[in-house]
Amino acid sequence: MRALLFALTLIACTATAAQDVSGVHDFDFLVGDWKVHHRRLKTRLAGSTERIEFDGTQSTRLALGGAGNVSDNWFDVPGGAYRGVSVRAFDTKTRSWAIWWLAGRDAHRALDPPLQGRFESAGTFYADDTFNGRPIRVRLIWSQITPTSAHWEQAFSPDGGTTWETNWISDFRRRKAQ
């Protein structure tokens, strides 16, 4: 009987541990409505340090039975506001996330290549892409995550990841329910 209880306890602990480390809930913090302050380089991969600052909103909802989510983004950029959509999906086999971006200003263009990665101390995601006809590496980092705030950074690397230029920084503040 003691052996049976020990085995059942071990199975329960193993199942709980597997659920806790799976990663499927890593983006749950993002579900809801956010005010976002953005700081983006005016010119990317050109040695520029001049940033454009603007505000926006993001509304995120779960999808794929909780193994994904969709974010509707609004950017109040000087020169004309626009929208974009982020789609995130979790792969249970690799325990990693894929993130796709669709810009509303160019909605008929193909989706950007998915960024892939996972959360450890922060969420870090990479993709190979092109910028102005040149191959680049893209990196996104989610950090400083609390129930009411989060920090996001995008960086490009023109040299395969040896050096990085952080070109977009966003600070998220959860909107109060109305």
Feature names for model-found ranges:
Residues 17-178:
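Hydrophobic small-molecule pocket/channel-lining residues, especially in calycin-type beta-barrels
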Residues 5-13:
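Bacterial N-terminal signal peptides
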